[in-house]
Swiss-Prot record:
Assembly description: (Microbial infection) Interacts with human cytomegalovirus protein UL26; this interaction inhibits global protein ISGylation. (Microbial infection) Interacts with Kaposi's sarcoma-associated herpesvirus protein v-IRF1; this interaction inhibits global protein ISGylation.
Modification note: ISGylated.
Name of this chain's protein: E3 ISG15--protein ligase HERC5
Domain HECT positions: 702-1024
Known EC number: 2.3.2.-
RCC1 repeat locations: 96-155, 156-208, 209-260, 262-312, 314-364
Active-site residues from the entry: 994
Tissues where the protein occurs: Expressed in testis and to a lesser degree in brain, ovary and placenta. Found in most tissues at low levels.
Keyword Transferase: yes
Keywords assigned: Antiviral defense, Cytoplasm, Host-virus interaction, Immunity, Innate immunity, Repeat, Transferase, Ubl conjugation, Ubl conjugation pathway
Organism of this sequence: Homo sapiens
Protein localization: Cytoplasm, Perinuclear region; Cytoplasm
Family annotation (CDD domains): HECTc
Family matches, as SUPFAM superfamilies: Hect, E3 ligase catalytic domain, RCC1/BLIP-II
Length: 1024
């Protein structure tokens, strides 16, 4: 029978190995097998065992066969003219070891055991080639071989590569030309991979999101990147019009992609027509195989120079490319430039029963060989696309139900596998992508939130997940991996409730922040772009996660290097989020502020570190390892910034005192004739010549004197300056200098705000001194009534004033310009009839050359308004403003001033008048002899609350030296009542302004109290 079958085959011309036709399959109801080119002996041998065949694998000159049970691999030599009838060699693993799958290269074979261990063999000697045990510690789920390199995908989602690397086909850079030690492809770390494939010297990986990465040899464009330069790191293939790819196949120097919609794309070498484009040209990018458009391709395979495609609806296999050995099944050995159906004879096309659901086609191509296997699905052909473990709703329900059952240990292993792997966790929550959908993020975060919420209902699962995140996943976060989908684990983790448990801040949140801080700028930008898409509530929750961690760290702050590193990472993380918020303006600044800093931060240490950091470019290692909180000003509320400013002032003053002391000691010791340095900056002024005296003395002092402690005395008055005299000094001085009658500033429209004049009546130096005085007031922790608009404080911080600032300075003008901007009428020019010239501060000027003849219209009106604002706030006052700024920053540290926002800076310089008189009464303190219910005190408060606002402000001047409050005093307005026993009702009320102490005689009548209070208000100046 066997001999007759062979003869019959010869007569029909279908058995010779070099011929094109396939061996006719036996009429088996169970399975059918076709070989192209035909090899009668091999065909018969395979067909007899087809029902138990688990895998067939081709490579140039060899066919490997794996049967059910996985006891061993049979390797057949495919030699021309042999018919493939030689006795195959058999490879077996160790005792009791089963084989799952096999793949072959040009000279090596890779065998994967059922328990996920890979073994490599030499194809000639069949000897086991041992490599280091790194893969023996992993469970491998997929393997693939190039000619001289291998890839392996682990269950944890890690991709390993080893072998030849002359063209970068390992994807690990060009560190070595080859290696026998498997290397992790770091570039794809964290990417949930679905499939891997290898060609002659190039490699490809398909992610679960449908993205394809390629690397290695590229002389024919087989990487699909649009050029022919080889790549030693995986690169994303683009230009697929958002098609989701479901399968990739690598030929020798060409590649093929199959999408979820059944479209076939090919690229790379086209010399033999293996791309199917009716051309022999190479393609550098994925190109659709037009001949198959309209059909749904369901399976593809690539040989060395040919390609196969199966259209299940038709029951036909199409082939194209090299037909040198008859591998196309076209009845000959000619090349085929476009897809044509495979034939089983010269006149009969292969036609499978496409309607059946019981059978499936297995299509194998390798070298110059094609194999078609039509078998029952129940035959259990090897699954070559085993995927990494992922999580879904069904898995969660099973986990919860498995507690203390026989499956419990298995369940715990599953939890550990998924929550220890960034790729597995990310792959669990991928969104389905439609072909027309553009999605920067492929995650279904709502699904993730729901599953996490369900999981955390069980404490044992919560604890186990926390342990997995801490011990494994966070240590494997892919900060080196540039693909965006590798970074999606960073989007996912903050959704995990364990990250928001306060006890986990050090074990989970800090490591997360440290990894993000190690990212490249490109990867960091991807994260920030994602954060910018978050809803307000989600974004706020993310900010709070890191802010809470900072607060928790401050609770245990001991200045150790580790804690400095922790806080540095957390603050850098908040800095990134704050940068995103500045663009989005989604959350108020207060969300980022850590109020606890005010009481937990050592401000003296903080200021000293700032000095050390500024003193040298190459800061000492000790300074570098210490976090400087004020480098992250967004975490400081205004009170903390003020405290930092005042601490800086105090240290400067103490430094000057110490320097003066050392100088005095040296002079005394050496009996030198030099003058000793004064430890203070002393001003003696006359009330009726206040401005004159101040300016004269300022011009005589050295710059170094200005930053000493200020002591002020008024001529002819007795008053030791412990703060109160300074307050009154600045109050009176600025009150005179800002008066419209004095002429130093202009008040547009008689408004309450003042601005610099276009043509000042004083020399520029006076504005310099005014800036010095403003800085001197701030340096000495004082507030002053300076009715500048917010625009001034913006300019001090190098920010541009806006139309809103002009509305504050000149309400009428601002309103008119707004009306101009809002008007969209067609008769705009007739209604407004204005030109690019302006009248401001009694001066006319052109905003642009020849502006008086250029009409403002709908097209240029925004430019007109912009130039108008710029003229008022910048161009018209440039000279005098620059002098003011120079004087101000001569006194104040610009770096610290720029920690403030404009509104905050205005509050700290100008103070506040948001009085709360009820709180003022509530905060009152009483020395012995008085209490809140004492008749005199009751009468005093009754009389006080009857006063007008202006009278109350005058009383504050009498009590404190100023009518303005610092930010820190808004809720702490205090007055201390003292009862001098020797005083009687004829004595007036007196005040110790430095300490807000009121000496109040025990008046017995309401009339006496009111008279005494009025006398104090009307005589609220002077000391002694």
């Amino acid at each position: 029978m066997e001999r007759r079958s062979r003869r019959k085959s010869r007569r029909n011309g279908r058995s010779t190995a070099g011929k094109a036709a396939a061996t006719q399959p036996a009429k088996s109801p169970g399975a059918q097998l076709w070989l192209f080119p035909s090899a009668a002996g091999l065909h018969r041998a395979l067909l007899r065992r087809v029902e138990v065949t688990r895998q067939l694998c081709c490579s140039p000159g060899r066919l490997a066969v794996l049967e059910r049970g996985g006891a061993g691999v049979q390797v057949h030599q495919l030699l021309a003219g042999s018919g493939g009838a030689r006795t195959p060699k058999c490879i077996k693993l160790g005792k009791n070891m089963k084989i799952h799958s096999v793949d072959q290269g040009a000279e090596h074979m890779l065998i994967l055991s059922s328990d996920g261990k890979p073994f490599e063999y030499d194809n000639y000697s069949m000897k086991h080639l041992r490599f280091e045990s790194i893969l023996q510690e992993k469970k491998i789920i997929q393997i693939t071989c190039g000619d001289y390199h291998s890839l392996a995908l682990s269950k944890g989602g890690e991709l390993f590569a080893w072998g030849q690397n002359l063209h970068g086909q390992l994807g690990v850079g060009r560190k070595f030309p080859s290696t026998t030690t498997p290397q992790i492809v770091e570039h794809l770390a964290g990417v949930p991979l679905a499939q891997i494939s290898a060609g002659e010297a190039h490699s490809m990986a398909l992610s679960m999101s449908g993205n394809i990465y390629s690397w290695g040899k590229n002389e024919c464009g087989q990487l699909g990147l649009g050029h022919t330069e080889s790549k030693d790191d995986p690169s994303l293939i683009e230009g697929l019009d958002n098609q989701k790819v479901e399968f990739v196949a690598c030929g020798g120097s060409h590649s093929a992609l199959l999408t979820q919609d059944g479209l076939l794309f090919t690229f790379g070498a086209g010399k033999h027509g293996q791309l199917g484009h009716n051309s022999t040209q190479n393609e550098l990018r994925p190109c659709l195989v037009a001949e198959l458009v309209g059909y749904r391709v369901t399976q593809i395979a690539c040989g060395r120079w040919h390609t196969l495609a199966y259209v299940s609806d038709l029951g036909k296999v199409f082939s194209f490319g090299s037909g040198k050995d008859g591998q196309l099944g076209n009845g000959g050995t000619r090349d085929q430039l476009m897809p044509l159906p495979v034939k089983v004879s010269s006149s009969e096309e292969l036609k499978l029963e496409s309607h059946t659901s019981e059978k499936e086609l297995i299509m194998i191509a390798g070298g110059n060989q094609s194999i078609l296997l039509w078998i029952k699905k129940e035959n259990s052909y090897v699954n070559l696309k085993r995927t990494i473990p992922t999580l879904n709703e069904g898995t969660v329900k099973r986990w919860i139900a498995d507690v203390e059952t026989k499956r419990w240990q298995s369940t715990k292993r599953e939890i550990q596998e998924i929550f220890s792997s960034p790729a597995c966790l990310t792959g669990s929550f991928l969104r389905k992508r439609r072909t027309t959908e553009m999605m920067p993020v492929y995650l279904d975060l709502n699904k993730a939130r729901n599953i996490f919420k369900e999981l955390t209902q069980k404490d044992w699962i919560t604890n186990m997940i926390t342990t997995c995140l801490k011990d494994n996943l966070l240590k494997r976060l892919p900060f080196h991996s540039p693909p965006q989908e590798a970074l999606e684990i960073f989007f996912l983790l903050p959704e995990c409730p364990m990250m928001h448990i306060s006890n986990n801040w050090e074990s989970l949140v800090v490591p997360f922040a440290k990894v993000v801080c190690k990212m490249s700028d490109q990867s960091s930008l991807v994260l920030e772009e994602y954060w910018a898409t978050l809803q307000e509530s989600t974004f706020s929750k993310l900010v709070q996660m890191f802010k809470t961690a900072v607060i928790c760290q401050l609770d245990y702050w001991d200045e150790s290097a580790e804690e400095n590193g922790n806080v540095q990472a957390l603050l850098e993380m908040l800095k990134k989020l704050h940068r995103v918020n500045q663009v989005k303006c989604q959350l108020p600044e207060s969300i980022f502020q850590v109020d606890e800093l005010l009481h937990r931060l050592n401000f003296f240490v903080e200021v000293c570190r700032r000095y050390l950091w500024k003193m040298t470019v190459d800061a000492s290692e000790n300074v570098q390892c210490c976090v400087i909180f004020s480098h992250f000003p967004f975490i400081f509320n205004n009170l903390s910034k003020i405290k930092l400013l005042h601490t800086d002032t105090l240290l400067k003053i103490e430094s000057k005192k110490h320097k003066a002391y050392l100088r005095s000691a040296a002079i005394e010791e050496e009996r030198e004739s030099e003058f000793a340095l004064r430890p203070t900056f002393d001003l003696t002024v006359r009330r009726n010549h206040l401005i004159e005296d101040v300016l004269n003395q300022l011009s005589q002092f050295e710059n170094e004197d200005l930053r000493k402690e200020l002591w002020v005395s008024f001529s002819g008055e007795i008053g030791y300056d412990l703060g109160g005299v300074k307050k009154e000094f600045f109050y009176c001085l600025f009150a005179e200098m800002i008066q419209p009658e004095y002429g130093m500033f202009m008040y547009p429209e008689g408004a309450s705000c003042m601005w610099f004049p276009v043509k000042p009546k004083f020399e520029k130096k006076r504005y310099f001194f005014f800036g010095v005085l403003c800085g001197l007031s701030l340096f000495n922790c004082n507030v002053a009534n300076l009715p500048f608009p917010l625009a001034l404080f913006k300019k001090l911080l190098d920010q541009m004033p806006s139309l809103e600032d002009l509305k504050e300075l000149s309400p009428d003008l601002g309103k008119n310009l707004q009306t101009l901007l809002d008007d969209e009428g067609d008769n705009f020019e007739e209604v407004f009839y204005i030109h690019f010239n302006v009248h401001w501060d009694r001066n006319d000027t052109n905003l642009i050359p020849n502006g008086s003849s250029i009409t403002v219209n709908q097209t240029n009106k925004r430019d007109y308004v912009s130039k108008y604002i710029n003229y008022i706030f910048n161009d018209s006052v440039k000279a005098v403003y620059e002098e003011f700024r120079r004087g101000f920053y001569k006194m104040c540290d610009e770096d610290i001033i720029k920690l403030f926002h404009p509104e905050e800076l205005k509050d700290v310089i100008v103070g506040n008048t948001d009085y709360d008189w009820k709180t003022f009464e509530k905060n009152a303190r009483y020395e012995p002899g008085y209490n809140s219910s004492h008749p005199t005190i009751v009468m005093f408060w009754k009389a006080f609350h009857k006063l007008t606002l202006e009278e109350k402000k005058k009383f504050l001047v009498f009590l404190t030296g100023t009518d303005r409050l610092q930010m820190k005093d808004l809720n702490n307005m205090k007055i201390t009542f003292c009862c001098p026993e020797s005083w009687n009702e004829r004595d007036p009320i007196r005040a110790l302004t430095c300490f807000s102490v009121l000496f109040l005689p025990k008046y017995s009548t309401m009339e006496t109290v009111e008279e005494a209070l009025q006398e104090a208000i009307n005589n609220n100046r002077g000391f002694g």
